[in-house]
Curated annotation (Swiss-Prot):
Reaction(s) catalysed (UniProt annotation): UDP-N-acetyl-alpha-D-muramoyl-L-alanine + D-glutamate + ATP = UDP-N-acetyl-alpha-D-muramoyl-L-alanyl-D-glutamate + ADP + phosphate + H(+)
Main location, first listed in the record: cytoplasm
Species whose genome carries this gene: Tropheryma whipplei (strain Twist) (Whipple's bacillus)
EC number: 6.3.2.9
Entry-linked NCBIfam families: murD
Family to which this protein belongs: Belongs to the MurCDEF family.
Name this protein carries in UniProt: UDP-N-acetylmuramoylalanine--D-glutamate ligase
Gene Ontology annotations for the cellular component aspect, listed alphabetically: cytoplasm
GO molecular function: ATP binding; tetrahydrofolylpolyglutamate synthase activity; UDP-N-acetylmuramoylalanine-D-glutamate ligase activity
Entry binding sites for ATP: G127, T128, N129, G130, K131, T132, T133
Length: 480
């Protein structure tokens, strides 16, 4: 066993070790900062110069080397920390492993040093869609109940920053992407063990990175591995149930289902418009605990089907750590969705304009379309190797027309729709898409930006894409 494998605490002997951090960003810097605080000699390798991080790395005493990944096969260090953008199947990573160099992720490192201030339960959340919303919902419920909670991970705040917070936390709600999960070990001291774990839903995504649907699903399933308290799964998504059934977990772990249906014992669901818990109350065999109503959720724009599913998942996770139902209800009354998630931008001349730019895969588009009856769909972007035909087969009667954006529109041949308008690449593709949608729309229609792909071919981010849509719609309304 290497010396690194035996390091299971902030207070272990890290002094004098050397580490290479591959990639820089918020998680890479958090790793560098933490390791320097532990007395580790740190060198950060990244292919581009990041002026902001260069100065920060200098300040903490870490070195920065501008280098590409394939230049690092012979790096000589005690261990390596990789960014979540680097595949564990990368040839360089494989070669480094062959040299017996331990390779950690920021999440594994955070797990090893989680006791710096205090050791608290981790609530792990993943899914193809809705994981950020579910994490924020769960965090808000725990906080409303008086707990000190950090929502961290893929959502943006590094887990290492949370575990080093001098005040400590009662819970960490950790959002995990498939990239982050694929880097986590299944065994040993670095294997993360959540108290409660959930996969919100599952569908094809990031196939260009994982290589196959099965490998993507396998990465997601790791969220349940080692769970010590509760595995929360989606009753409307059979794959998540299979994951729980196949997971290696601690003894006496309970499986809790959630879904848009009347709940059975051990489940969270809906009865006559009331969200109910039949999983965590002692009299669950013959009664249910009321949490809130769909009517109340509607007042806070949380009543779309896929959002209610996220709410139910968060309710299950919050109840798994004994959060008071009244606190959960109050948190839901105050919760606001993040922008670019089925966000109503305008209602003009009987047409509703909806920004769902966060929908970066077909599963998210399907979830969004399920809420509307007649849609002009603005669709396209970097499709990440997934098949889009299922969307248009399933919603042929719902989708009145498709306005296609994106530089590569080769997928258009897989679209089955009554009307297709392709927007050529330009300096302002979104304004052209909005103008085209306006010509197609009639009273009673919804114009829905739900692209189904990443934004980076024409926009800086999904937020930028969504803001371009919002601005184009506002300009259109002004002209009318």
């Amino acid at each position: 066993m290497s010396r690194v494998e035996g390091l299971t605490s902030w207070y272990s002997d890290w002094q004098g070790l050397s580490a290479a951090i591959l990639g820089i960003g918020v998680s890479g810097f958090a790793a560098a900062d933490s390791l320097r605080e532990l007395g580790v000699d740190v060198t950060v390798y990244a292919p581009e110069k990041h002026t902001r991080y260069n100065k920060l790395l200098d300040a903490i005493g870490a070195r920065y080397v501008c280098a590409y990944l394939d230049e690092l096969c012979e790096v000589d260090v005690d261990f390596i920390v990789v960014s979540p953008g680097i595949s564990p199947d990368n040839p360089v990573i494989k070669r480094l492993r062959d040299r017996q160099i331990p390779i950690l992720s920021e999440i594994e490192l955070a797990w090893r040093v989680r006791d710096k201030v205090n050791t608290c339960p981790w609530i792990l959340i993943t899914g193809t869609n809705g994981k950020t919303t579910t994490a924020l919902l769960t965090g808000s419920m725990l906080a409303k109940d008086g707990a000190r909670v950090a929502v961290c991970g893929n959502i943006g705040t590094p887990v290492l920053d949370a575990v080093r917070n001098p005040k400590g936390f009662d819970y960490l709600v950790v959002e995990l992407s498939s990239f982050q999960l694929s880097l986590l070990p299944m065994h040993g001291n670095g294997a993360v063990k959540g108290f409660s774990s959930a996969c919100v839903n599952l569908d094809e995504d990031h196939l260009e990175w994982h290589g196959a649907k099965e490998l993507y699903y396998c990465a997601k399933s790791r969220v349940y591995h080692g769970t010590t308290g509760f595995c929360v799964y989606n009753l409307d998504d059979e794959e998540t149930k299979k994951m729980v059934e196949q997971a290696c977990v601690a003894r006496n772990v309970r499986a809790i289902g959630f879904g848009l249906c009347v709940p059975d014992v051990g489940q969270v669901g809906i009865v006559d418009g009331i969200l109910c818990d039949r999983a965590f109350l002692s009299a669950r065999k013959d009664s249910a605990l009321e949490i809130t109503s769909v009517e109340k959720l509607e007042k806070n724009k949380l009543s779309m089907r896929h959002i209610i599913s996220d709410v139910l998942c968060a309710v299950a996770l919050a109840r798994s750590v004994e959060t008071n139902p009244l606190s959960i209800s109050r948190a839901l009354d105050e919760f606001c969705l993040s922008p670019h998630r089925t966000e109503v931008v305008a209602k003009e001349m009987g047409v509703m304009w909806v920004n769902d730019s966060k929908a970066t895969n077909p599963h998210a588009v399907i979830a969004s379309l399920s809420n509307f009856s007649r849609v002009i769909l603005i669709f396209g972007g970097l499709m990440k190797g997934v098949d889009v035909s299922g969307i248009f087969d399933r919603f042929y009667e719902t989708i009145k027309a498709v306005v296609v954006i994106g530089k590569n529109q080769s997928f258009v041949g897989n679209i089955k729709c009554k009307k297709i308008v392709c927007i050529p690449d330009s300096n302002d593709p979104m304004s052209e898409a909005v103008a085209a949608a306006d010509l197609l729309a009639t009273p009673g229609d919804t114009v829905l930006l739900s692209p189904g792909g990443s934004s980076f071919d024409q926009f800086e981010s999904y937020e930028h894409r969504g803001n371009c849509f919002i601005n184009a719609v506002k300009d259109l309304v002004k002209r009318k």
